[in-house]
C-alpha cells in the first residue's frame, strides 16, 4: 500500500462494472497509473464528485499486481476553472498523456509542466495555442525525443534562419529546396529550440511539427478530444 499521499490528476475514466471505474491518473512520483476505483459509480459514493479531470488530487492505493486499487482520494485544491476552449484543450492534453506515457514510469518534471499548463489554460484562455505547443514540446522531451533544431543533420552547420530544411524522422533537419509538409524555415527551427511561439508563422509551424513528431507515439487511432473539438468548434482546428 502507498502510505504517503501522492499528488495526481485524472487523465481518463472508463466503466469497469456496474459500480466501479478504471481511472488513469498522472501522478508526480509514479507517472501514469491505472487504478480500480471500487463503488465510485454508486450514488452515495464520496469519491464520485472527487475523481474529475482538472482537480489536483491527493491519492493512496494498494495492491501487488498490475491493477491496483484506489483506497483514498481527496482534492488538494479547487478544480481548475476550464471554460470552452480551455476545457477541450485540457481534454486534448489528458488524452495525449494517457496514450504516450509508459505505465509506472515517473515523469516528475513533466508533471510540473502539466500543472503549469493546466493553470495557464484556466487563467489565460486567449493564449491556448502557445500553451499547448509549449506542453507538446515538453512532452516530446520527456519521452526522450531528441532532435537538434540548431544544426543541419547532414553537415553539422548552424541552421540559417533564411534557409528551408526538410525534417527526416530519426535524422533531423536537413537543408533542402523541397517544399512539402515536412519543410520548415530556419528561423522557426531556432524559435523551436527556445520554445518561442510569439510569432504567428512560428506557432503554425510548431503545430505542424508536433503533429508529425507525436504521431508515432499516439498511433493511428484518431484523438477523440480532437474530433470533439472539431464537432463543436470546427474552425479552430483548421490548418
Curated annotation (Swiss-Prot):
Pfam families tied to this protein? RecO_C (PF02565), RecO_N (PF11967)
Would the keyword Phosphoprotein be found if you checked this record's keyword annotation? no
What are the UniProt keywords, alphabetically? DNA damage, DNA recombination, DNA repair
Q: Which domain of life is it from?
A: Bacteria
Q: Which GO terms describe its cellular component?
A: bacterial nucleoid
GO biological process annotation, one example = double-strand break repair
Under InterPro entries, the record lists: ARFGAP/RecO, DNA_rep/recomb_RecO_N, NA-bd_OB-fold, RecO, RecO_C
Instruction: Explain the purpose of this protein.
Output: Involved in DNA repair and RecF pathway recombination.
* Record family assignment: Belongs to the RecO family.
Protein's name in the database: DNA repair protein RecO
- Gene designation per UniProt: recO
